[in-house]
Every structure is written in C-alpha cells, then in structure tokens.
C-alpha cells in the first residue's frame, strides 16, 4: 500500500489512499486469493472498490503504478502498455510519460499511445498506419527518423505551424 501510494503521487494523486484486501478464493489458475483494491482519490472520501469509484483515467494511472511497483520485484524484462495513458492529458500526461520513461531505464517498454506528451519521451518512435482496400485492412509499422518524428508529433497536436513549433519544443525538452 505504501509503495502504491508513493507511485501514484508521482502520477498526480496528491492525497490518494489505498487499501489492499486479500480474501480467500476457490483455487484456480490465478491462485487461491482474490485481491481487491480499495481507493479514495480525495481526503474525506471513504475507501471503495477501485472499479466502482475511479474514472477510466484514474484506473489507468493506478494500473501503471501497480505495474511499476511489481516491475521492481519481477524479473520480467519487457512491459507492454496499450494506451495506459487513456483519458488523461496536460500535466497528468507529462507525469505518466515520465513514469513510463523511468521504467524504460531498467526494462524494455513498448507503449502504444496517442498523446504527444508521452510519445515525445520514447527512445524510438514507431508509427502504426492502417490502410484498407475496401475488403481488407492492413497495418504497417515503421520507425520514424527525427524529422518524421517532429511531423508526427505535430500531427498529433492538430497540425499547422503552431503545432510544428510545439512538437519541436516538446522533443527538445526530453
């Protein structure tokens, strides 16, 4: 609980509280315990089941915090996040990006994201492009060079000259 609280503070939860409840469950492929995460994002609000009270963006950040805590103990060399930054933006997205980049110092991290605040911190930036001929949809993936990366971040920011300047600034801040 302490480690989870510390990690979520980094992700923008200044006063969140957690309680982990471990209850016996029918033994199966996932073990013989059932873990429930009780959560409160704000002081004075009682702890309740995470899935009942947290927004989708809050759940994503809590899951990133859980993965971060577990990654320190696990010997798993690769972490894959598929839109772990969903439904967040602004300063929170910057914090999430920094946490993912921090994980990448000791693990191989593959992160699928639509947020320029997160993408800018990637060591390598890949673009997945879909195309269709009306019958089939195909996906292509390719690594972006520095110039293409600026263009892609600018596109993600909405396009235009201001977005291009913003993309260049974001990449310089890395």
Report residues per predicted region:
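Short flexible coil/turn linkers enriched for glycine and charged/polar residues
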Residues: 10-16, 28-33, 43-46, 58, ...
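Flexible glycine-/small-residue-rich
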Residues: 20-24, 39-43, 66-68, 130, ...
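C-terminal lobe/lid and adjacent interdomain/linker elements of RecA-like ASCE P-loop ATPase modules
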Residues: 35, 91-174
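GG-anchored amphipathic helix commonly corresponding to the ABC/SMC/Rad50 NBD signature/C-loop
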Residues: 37, 41-43, 57-79
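Conserved D-loop-proximal element of ABC-family nucleotide-binding domains
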Residues: 73-74, 86-94
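Walker B catalytic acidic pair
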Residues: 82-83
């Amino acid at each position: 609980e302490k480690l989870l609280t510390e990690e979520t503070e980094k992700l923008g939860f200044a006063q969140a509280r957690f309680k982990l409840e471990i209850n016996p469950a029918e033994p199966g492929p996932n073990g013989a315990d059932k873990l429930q995460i009780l959560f409160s994002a704000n002081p004075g609000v009682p702890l309740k089941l995470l899935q009942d009270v947290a927004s989708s963006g809050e759940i994503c950040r809590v899951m990133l915090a859980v993965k971060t805590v577990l990654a320190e103990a696990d010997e798993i060399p690769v972490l894959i996040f598929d839109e772990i930054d969903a439904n967040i933006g602004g300063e929170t997205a910057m914090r999430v990006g920094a946490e993912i980049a921090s994980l990448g110092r000791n693990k191989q991290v593959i992160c699928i994201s639509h947020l320029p605040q997160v993408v800018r911190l990637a060591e390598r930036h890949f673009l997945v492009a879909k195309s269709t001929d009306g019958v089939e949809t195909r996906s292509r993936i390719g690594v972006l060079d520095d110039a293409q990366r600026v263009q892609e971040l600018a596109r993600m920011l909405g396009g235009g000259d201001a977005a291009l300047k913003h993309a260049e600034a974001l990449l310089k801040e890395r």
